[in-house]
Amino acid sequence: MNPSPNTQHPTPSSLPYREGRGGSFIFETRMEVRDYECDIEGIVNNANYLHYIEHTRHLFLRSLGASFADMHQKGVDAVVARMNLQYKIPLRCDDEFISRLALRKEGIRYIFHQDLYRASDEQLCFRAKVELVCLVNGRLAESSEYDEIFKKYIEE
């Protein structure tokens, strides 16, 4: 998914910490709803919210100097194991929204709490809990590489 032209990519350290459901948000980016993402009712089709939060995770990783493609070349793939989604207030065509992310680790799972807020009034539109696990050379395993990348955010 391509970001809209006005998408901003702050570094995690430049983001003021803000409490979210899953802890402090450590990353945010802005995006805009495009007309083709909406259904006949004029609201964002439910599947597009998954694109928004996935794109946010990719931008977050890139802001830390890594990428899913680079990790794949090393034989390490972070894959979604489970999602819990809550649709709150629909986004509509041309709405600008803020995607915020918090992260913690439980066992071998990386837990991302991701919220989408309508920029005009900070109304919560969508909330997700996304659990990722790593496949190292095709097998479920701990990833020392991802632990290193995320260490600032997952150390207790």
Segments and roles (model prediction):
Residues 2-3, 17, 28-29, 92-93, ...:
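HotDog/MaoC-like acyl-thioester-processing domains
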Residues 4-11:
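Arg/Gly-rich low-complexity intrinsically disordered repeat tracts
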Residues 23, 74, 121:
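Short, glycine- and charge-enriched coil/turn segments that flank and shape catalytic ligand pockets
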Residues 2-3, 17, 22-60:
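Catalytic strand-loop segment that frames the active site of acyl-thioester-processing enzymes
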Residues 37, 84, 131:
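Short aromatic/hydrophobic contact patches that present stacked aromatics
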Residues 60-110, 127:
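Hydrophobic beta-strand-centered segment that forms part of the acyl-chain substrate-binding groove
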Residues 46, 69, 142:
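Short, electropositive, low-hydrophobicity segments enriched in small/polar residues
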